[in-house]
Amino acid sequence: MATQADLMELDMAMEPDRKAAVSHWQQQSYLDSGIHSGATTTAPSLSGKGNPEDEDVDTNQVLYEWEQGFSQSFTQDQVADIDGQYAMTRAQRVRAAMFPETLDEGMQIPSTQFDSAHPTNVQRLAEPSQMLKHAVVNLINYQDDAELATRAIPELTKLLNDEDQVVVNKAAVMVHQLSKKEASRHAIMRSPQMVSAIVRTMQNTNDVETARCTAGTLHNLSHHREGLLAIFKSGGIPALVKMLGSPVDSVLFYAITTLHNLLLHQEGAKMAVRLAGGLQKMVALLNKTNVKFLAITTDCLQILAYGNQESKLIILASGGPQALVNIMRTYSYEKLLWTTSRVLKVLSVCSSNKPAIVEAGGMQALGLHLTDSSQRLVQNCLWTLRNLSDAATKQEGMEGLLGTLVQLLGSDDINVVTCAAGILSNLTCNNYKNKMMVCQVGGIEALVRTVLRAGDREDITEPAICALRHLTSRHQEAEMAQNAVRLHYGLPVVVKLLHPPSHWPLIKATVGLIRNLALCPANHAPLREQGAIPRLVQLLVRAHQDTQRRTSIGGTQQQFVEGVRMEEIVEGCTGALHILARDIHNRIVIRGLNTIPLFVQLLYSPIENIQRVAAGVLCDVAQDKEAAEAIEAEGATAPLTELLHSRNEGVATYAAAVLFRMSEDKPQDYKKRLSVELTSSLFRTEPMPWNEAADLGLDIGAQGEPLGYRQDDSSYRSFHAAGYGQDAMGMDSMMDHDMGGHHPGADYPVDGLPDLSHAQDLMDGLPPGDSNQLAWFDTDL
């Protein structure tokens, strides 16, 4: 147990620490709670002392530390004197804060402000009065400037018209200085004589400084609508266009920015610039290297070209497409690239400018910016590429662009995906190399995934399906592509697109894709299991009855429904069934749908391609003996015999093959007569026995030469042609048009037909005709 002496010794050892803690808290101006200082139960004091009865604390030391914060001490009399002095000078302090200019010079007023960072209450209250004072001063100065300018303008106008160029120069400098102040600027623009003198001087002077000052004055005036009108009325636009030929950069800058302001805000300025030859001058300036200057110049070109075909042709004649493409290829300044892409977008809907842009390398140059961080630049480039893509199907060196477009199909931006799909659709049409490249970079998987994600957005699904249709025929990787669609789970969604709510353009594209997919034997069973055959027959019956109805009422011209001719649907569906009929199980399904009478009827069609696909499907169906008998029973012999003399070799060959198969169980004498007839019909120039003709027609329709589609037809659908890029729509609304060409709100359902083996009236559900759209063909169906 500790002794009394031990406790006393411990207490004495702790005492200095307690005093140091108290001193520390006093210096920090904290109110000591008594916890850290070692005080026990007594109330804390202002000095931070513990027990007041503790006589061991050094009182002098504590008091000295308490007074350390004061630099000097004051007696009671001194405090009273200072207080009186402050009371006597209160009015002067208020006046000094609010109206310091009214004080006598050298007058000393005691300040109540201890910290310069914290204003006194009087100073804070004086701020509004100071602001008011400055406003009044500015108003007085403004009025002085206006009065000065008003008095000086008549004299300066005379000086600008002086014959002495030195005088004119001095006057131009003075007017330029006046135009920098708002009051005098308004006075100048309200004087038509002055503005006319400025314009005339700028146009006629040979002095660089005079030209710079007058152009600068007009630039300052152009920031006000009143100034723009004054410049316009004074004939300033032709003068400014003339200044675009100046060798001085500052004059060029003033001229182009003033013209830009006029084009943006002054009615009639566009026509005046065109008439003054502004377009030619601006195109010539595109070889400059100042990116900000080029940005303004290209924006002027966009304003002038938008909605004006004549301006587009002038830009073309002046070499604009090449210069604009060079800018896209050379610079990285975002605003310049954006304004230039806007000009190219406007020009890309012009049939004359389009090939010029493509030949200048526009597709490749625009493709360089598809991964830019600027969304507005990317979108403009995509719109332009989409408009150009139908004219670029023969372009070389598109590998980089195609790879980027395939990547963009995975974008979350619907507009980006729509454009990318449309561009790919056009670029893969009839271009062997492009098809190969897209397949090699994973295009099939990306397009199938795009269709799956798009749902019922036909502005995406239609171009994506068209691209798949192109990629699945007539190139080395076509068979791989046909398999890839199945392997990436594309067949169910493709067949689904044959059903409502799909519109005719999408249905036509889907029918063509199914026909190509059927070229791959591995797809026969899956397509059958997905119900493709019954739906194709339904669509065929509906389209055929529509054509029959129009023929019966005396219609001679082919009608369009949502831009699609029903004859194209008849041809497409029959062609797809023809390829599917290569599979025995598919032939059974096709025959079971009572289609043979319809196929025989199609042999009488006046359209040669329908005759060909009808004869083709009958050729494959006739491989089965029962089907051959049914074909003969429907009276097919007469039309088939007539088609033997067709000038179309495919039609004649198929007809011969059907007749040959129908004759297999006929007497030998009949076969001999038929052989003579076939030989004389098919081999007019080089006769050969029919039995040497082997199985003529059995291989026709193979992958390399798709029967039923115009292989020699050079026209095909351009995705921008259904409404894209029309100037009257405004460039930012171009995306409002559907690639499929159907009109929003005009929902034409394609209802399913429950039982095609009965001759029921299918005409009530047909969509009404729409002759406002142009037909389109695609050689890659």
From Swiss-Prot:
<feature type="repeat" description="ARM 7">
    <location>
        <begin position="479"/>
        <end position="519"/>
    </location>
</feature>
<dbReference type="InterPro" id="IPR000225">
    <property type="entry name" value="Armadillo"/>
</dbReference>
<keyword id="KW-0879">Wnt signaling pathway</keyword>
<keyword id="KW-0804">Transcription</keyword>
<feature type="repeat" description="ARM 3">
    <location>
        <begin position="267"/>
        <end position="306"/>
    </location>
</feature>
<dbReference type="GO" id="GO:0042060">
    <property type="term" value="P:wound healing"/>
</dbReference>
<dbReference type="GO" id="GO:0005654">
    <property type="term" value="C:nucleoplasm"/>
</dbReference>
<feature type="repeat" description="ARM 8">
    <location>
        <begin position="521"/>
        <end position="562"/>
    </location>
</feature>
<dbReference type="GO" id="GO:0016342">
    <property type="term" value="C:catenin complex"/>
</dbReference>
<dbReference type="GO" id="GO:0045892">
    <property type="term" value="P:negative regulation of DNA-templated transcription"/>
</dbReference>
<dbReference type="GO" id="GO:0019903">
    <property type="term" value="F:protein phosphatase binding"/>
</dbReference>
<keyword id="KW-0539">Nucleus</keyword>
<dbReference type="Pfam" id="PF00514">
    <property type="entry name" value="Arm"/>
</dbReference>
<protein>
    <recommendedName>
        <fullName>Catenin beta-1</fullName>
    </recommendedName>
</protein>
<dbReference type="GO" id="GO:0061037">
    <property type="term" value="P:negative regulation of cartilage development"/>
</dbReference>
<dbReference type="GO" id="GO:0045296">
    <property type="term" value="F:cadherin binding"/>
</dbReference>
<dbReference type="GO" id="GO:0045294">
    <property type="term" value="F:alpha-catenin binding"/>
</dbReference>
<keyword id="KW-0832">Ubl conjugation</keyword>
<dbReference type="InterPro" id="IPR016024">
    <property type="entry name" value="ARM-type_fold"/>
</dbReference>
<dbReference type="GO" id="GO:0032331">
    <property type="term" value="P:negative regulation of chondrocyte differentiation"/>
</dbReference>
<dbReference type="GO" id="GO:0002062">
    <property type="term" value="P:chondrocyte differentiation"/>
</dbReference>
<feature type="repeat" description="ARM 6">
    <location>
        <begin position="432"/>
        <end position="473"/>
    </location>
</feature>
<dbReference type="InterPro" id="IPR011989">
    <property type="entry name" value="ARM-like"/>
</dbReference>
<keyword id="KW-0010">Activator</keyword>
<dbReference type="GO" id="GO:0031076">
    <property type="term" value="P:embryonic camera-type eye development"/>
</dbReference>
<feature type="repeat" description="ARM 4">
    <location>
        <begin position="351"/>
        <end position="390"/>
    </location>
</feature>
<dbReference type="GO" id="GO:0045944">
    <property type="term" value="P:positive regulation of transcription by RNA polymerase II"/>
</dbReference>
<feature type="region of interest" description="Disordered">
    <location>
        <begin position="34"/>
        <end position="56"/>
    </location>
</feature>
<dbReference type="GO" id="GO:0003401">
    <property type="term" value="P:axis elongation"/>
</dbReference>
<dbReference type="GO" id="GO:0014704">
    <property type="term" value="C:intercalated disc"/>
</dbReference>
<feature type="repeat" description="ARM 2">
    <location>
        <begin position="225"/>
        <end position="264"/>
    </location>
</feature>
<dbReference type="GO" id="GO:0009948">
    <property type="term" value="P:anterior/posterior axis specification"/>
</dbReference>
<dbReference type="GO" id="GO:0045893">
    <property type="term" value="P:positive regulation of DNA-templated transcription"/>
</dbReference>
<feature type="region of interest" description="Disordered">
    <location>
        <begin position="735"/>
        <end position="781"/>
    </location>
</feature>
<dbReference type="GO" id="GO:0001502">
    <property type="term" value="P:cartilage condensation"/>
</dbReference>
<feature type="repeat" description="ARM 5">
    <location>
        <begin position="391"/>
        <end position="429"/>
    </location>
</feature>
<feature type="repeat" description="ARM 1">
    <location>
        <begin position="141"/>
        <end position="180"/>
    </location>
</feature>
<dbReference type="GO" id="GO:0005912">
    <property type="term" value="C:adherens junction"/>
</dbReference>
<dbReference type="GO" id="GO:0045178">
    <property type="term" value="C:basal part of cell"/>
</dbReference>
<dbReference type="GO" id="GO:0005911">
    <property type="term" value="C:cell-cell junction"/>
</dbReference>
<feature type="compositionally biased region" description="Basic and acidic residues">
    <location>
        <begin position="735"/>
        <end position="745"/>
    </location>
</feature>
<keyword id="KW-0472">Membrane</keyword>
